């Protein structure tokens, strides 16, 4: 009875949680009775701890309401329920691929004179990108959690997994980390990572060589296919057609697909609706620009890997001024380290100011409160004067709060200074706005998207 009630409990959780929260934390759970105990099996420790910390009260309350004193005890475990049957792995077709000794990436040639062999598909997975060296923060926590689950249960956890966000935020790192995780668990797994333009080039070459069937067999035989920057499929009708059928074939065989893009699937122009619809079949997760604490952690990790002692105050100084993406942070730190090695000077705040003076000057020039106000007003189609007015209607107040939150995150101005710039408001008003927008970014997909879009615009 308890197991059947678990299905009803799932229904309640689905009603109370966002679609992403439900897909991420509840859908992977499996339930089975063990005596008078209901055992909930999670795919990994991360999911187990999260569900136990965040949702245990809701689950207990549901069973108490339904069964009273007869409610089962709850226990959490990692893995699959013992009675769950594991499907037999699908047979992998033999395919013709390029000689792995050549410099070309896997899948770049379809010469029909080459022998038919089983492909070494994983030669383009970068072994340096691991979960252990991926710096986690609130901005990428869900993305990493989803990627971990896919690595442990490819084709079963979230399929497809769609990661989206701006350039240099770690999407590619996660793709390779998943690939390395899959290969660690199954050394014979056939995993392919590539940029979407490589898929297009392979298809064009196959058409030129009358080897399109070879192309199809190759891509439909892999255990996992990871394609970066899927937005480059835009307006390439034949490539979209081939990928559509490849996508369907892989999903039907329970083979894992992970895609990345710089924008939400439905916002990708020039891509067929049937593809965009399929992109959302599994789990879609945003990777956002790192918050201050994560930026500091990234700098400290990079410095440690480089054998450099980076003082905390220097890391905070850099992190507060460079906010757009991880790549920019690492590039700035590399410049600081190179200058320090060349001059023999210690790394201090004054030294960093000198080493990064052009970059810091550009950032200060680009991101000002006035610039933020104008950008937000234009984005929400309100008047610039509304940013300074006392109007409280939501159509005006919400954009104003967004602009205040962005001003706190993207400038070095204090709360009182931000309040002055918004019509002489008190610093507590600014603090309330920042907290409100932080809350809404957790609860509202629209606000989350708006905020991410504005940061990309202001940081570009």
Swiss-Prot record:
Listed GO biological process terms: DNA replication initiation; regulation of DNA replication
Annotated stretches, region: Domain I, interacts with DnaA modulators: 1-84
UniProt key word Nucleus: no
Gene Ontology CC: cytoplasm; plasma membrane
Binding site for ATP: 168, 170-172
A single MF term (Gene Ontology): ATP binding
Pfam family, one: Bac_DnaA_C
Annotated localization: Cytoplasm
CDD domains in UniProt: AAA, Bac_DnaA_C
Entry remark concerning the domains of this protein: Domain I is involved in oligomerization and binding regulators, domain II is flexibile and of varying length in different bacteria, domain III forms the AAA+ region, while domain IV binds dsDNA.
Family from the record: Belongs to the DnaA family.
Protein name: Chromosomal replication initiator protein DnaA
Organism whose genome encodes this protein: Shewanella sp. (strain MR-7)
């Amino acid at each position: 009875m308890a197991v059947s009630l678990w299905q009803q409990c799932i229904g309640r959780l689905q009603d109370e949680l966002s679609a992403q929260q439900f897909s991420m934390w509840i859908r992977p759970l499996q339930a089975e009775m063990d005596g008078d105990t209901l055992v909930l099996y999670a795919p990994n420790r991360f999911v187990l701890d999260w569900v136990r910390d965040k949702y245990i009260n809701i689950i207990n309350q549901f069973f108490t309401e339904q069964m009273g004193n007869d409610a089962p005890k709850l226990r959490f475990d990692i893995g699959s329920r013992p009675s769950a049957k594991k499907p037999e792995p699908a047979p992998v077709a033999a395919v013709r691929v390029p000689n792995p000794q050549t410099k070309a990436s896997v899948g770049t040639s379809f010469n029909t004179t080459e022998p038919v062999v089983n492909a070494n598909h994983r030669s383009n997975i970068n072994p340096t990108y691991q979960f252990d060296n991926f710096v986690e923060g609130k901005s990428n926590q869900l993305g990493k959690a989803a990627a971990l689950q896919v690595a442990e249960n490819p084709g079963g956890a979230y399929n497809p997994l769609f990661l989206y966000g701006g350039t240099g935020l770690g999407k590619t790192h996660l793709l390779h980390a998943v690939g390395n995780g899959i290969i660690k668990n199954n050394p014979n797994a056939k995993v392919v990572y590539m940029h979407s333009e490589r898929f297009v080039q392979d298809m064009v070459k196959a058409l030129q060589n009358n080897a399109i069937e070879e192309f199809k067999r190759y891509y439909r035989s892999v255990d996992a296919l990871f394609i970066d920057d899927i937005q480059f499929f835009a307006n390439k009708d034949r490539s979209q057609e081939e990928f559509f059928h490849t996508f369907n074939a892989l999903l039907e065989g329970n083979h894992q697909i992970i895609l990345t893009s710089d924008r939400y699937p439905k916002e990708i122009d020039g891509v067929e609706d049937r593809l965009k619809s399929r992109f959302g079949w599994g789990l879609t997760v945003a990777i956002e620009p790192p918050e201050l604490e994560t930026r500091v952690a990234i700098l400290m990790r990079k410095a440690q890997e480089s054998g450099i002692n980076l003082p905390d105050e220097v890391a905070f100084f850099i992190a507060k001024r460079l906010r757009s993406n991880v790549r920019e942070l690492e590039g700035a730190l590399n410049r600081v380290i190179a200058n320090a090695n060349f001059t023999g000077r210690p790394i201090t705040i004054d030294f960093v100011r000198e080493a990064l003076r052009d970059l810091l000057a550009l950032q200060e020039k680009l991101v000002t409160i006035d610039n933020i106000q104008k950008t937000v007003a234009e984005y929400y189609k309100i008047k610039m004067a509304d940013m300074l007015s006392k109007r409280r209607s939501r159509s005006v107040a919400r954009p104003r709060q967004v602009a205040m939150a962005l001003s706190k995150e993207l400038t070095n101005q204090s709360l009182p200074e931000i309040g002055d710039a918004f019509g002489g408001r008190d610093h507590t008003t600014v603090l309330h706005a920042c907290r409100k927008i932080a809350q809404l970014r957790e609860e509202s997909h629209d606000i989350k998207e708006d905020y991410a879009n504005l940061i990309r615009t202001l940081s570009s």
